[in-house]
Amino acid sequence: DHLDLHSFPTRRSSDLNHDIVILTGGLGPTNDDVTKLSLAEFFESDLVSDPQVLKDVEEFFLKRNLGLTEKNRNQALVPAKAKIIRNRYGTAPGMWFDANEKIVIALPGVPFEMKNILEFEIIPRLKNRFSGTCVVQKTVNTLGIGESFLSDKLADWETNLHPQIRLAYLPAAGIVKLRLTAKGQNEEFLNSIVEAEIQKLDPLISKYIWGFDNDTLEGICAALLLQKKQTLTTAESCTGGYLAHKITALPGSSQYYKGSIIAYSNALKTKLLNIPESEITGYGSVSKQVVELMAINGCKAMQSDYCVAISGIAGPGGASIEKPLGTVWIAVAHKENVISAKFQFGDQRHTNIVRSAVAALGMLREVLLK
């Protein structure tokens, strides 16, 4: 945001200490976007207008029927010493500088723009540049066990990992991923040692493993539903449609997903899901009895083969001594058969919503696999 703050610690490109430096952000059209100016100063390079970038910017605004300002045109001003990396998702191009056998890369700060350029442009170029080194990665996705408990279970296995393999624990809301990375000269050998370690890992935590690499729970459930030629609906309370959002984010979900009943209030639980008021009064809306009825009646209302129901206390209000913040009940019904489980999450509303949806998909997967 300020030129002095964005300047490199050293003042000459020959002083760079790292082989690769990647910067994100500050490439936009506003006055606080000064990364481009800092790089021009650092590499002692004039700013010049790049015809391809200007064309991309003009087409970007034309497609959206938006007027083009001088500030927008200035997006095409780039340091003359930079190799331009086209941004097909926005207006700020990426920039690649070669200096004294070092590489400096500047990418837009908008996450999806940065991610796409990194994945489809930067990583392939870096692999080509450093083709002598092979990197093999495999990710094991787990559910239902925390990072520290997982680490305890795997202590001996981790201690005896092949010396060329590095392990990383990558926790997210309700999920922990184990990433194994091997580096060396022989890709076939690296694949073999990674696969051997996963074969040792599987019996230790098999009940927690649900997928690998880029698998998603919603994707696995989708494949199982399509395989069975069966349909799904959801009945949501505390998640407010977030589970439906995850399911419908997949293209083709209309082939198996019928829709969602978002019964946030008790009145709608009674009206739309036919939950007797006596059940809600007697047990509370966050209860085994109510969530199971939500799932069973959701199947009936939507005429679907399966229904996943969620009811909980996302917070920050609504908790009691009996039902503290983060209490969530989830049920999965298949016709008249239903299973349910109680979860105790934390005190952060959004995290509780995300973890509820993840846990619900995990339960659905288990039912579909039976």
Language model features: what each stretch is:
Residues 1-13:
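Short, small-residue-biased leader/transition segments that mark boundaries at the very start
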Residues 12-23, 280-288:
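Short, structured active-site "lid" loops
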Residues 23-46, 201, 205-212:
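Flexible gly/pro-rich beta->alpha loop and the following alpha-helix that scaffold active-site loops
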Residues 23-31, 108, 183, 310-313:
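Glycine-rich beta-strand-to-loop/alpha-helix junction loops that act as flexible
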Residues 98-174, 179-181, 189-194:
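Accessory alpha-helical/coil subdomains and C-terminal extensions
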Residues 187-370:
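Short alpha-helical segments enriched in small residues
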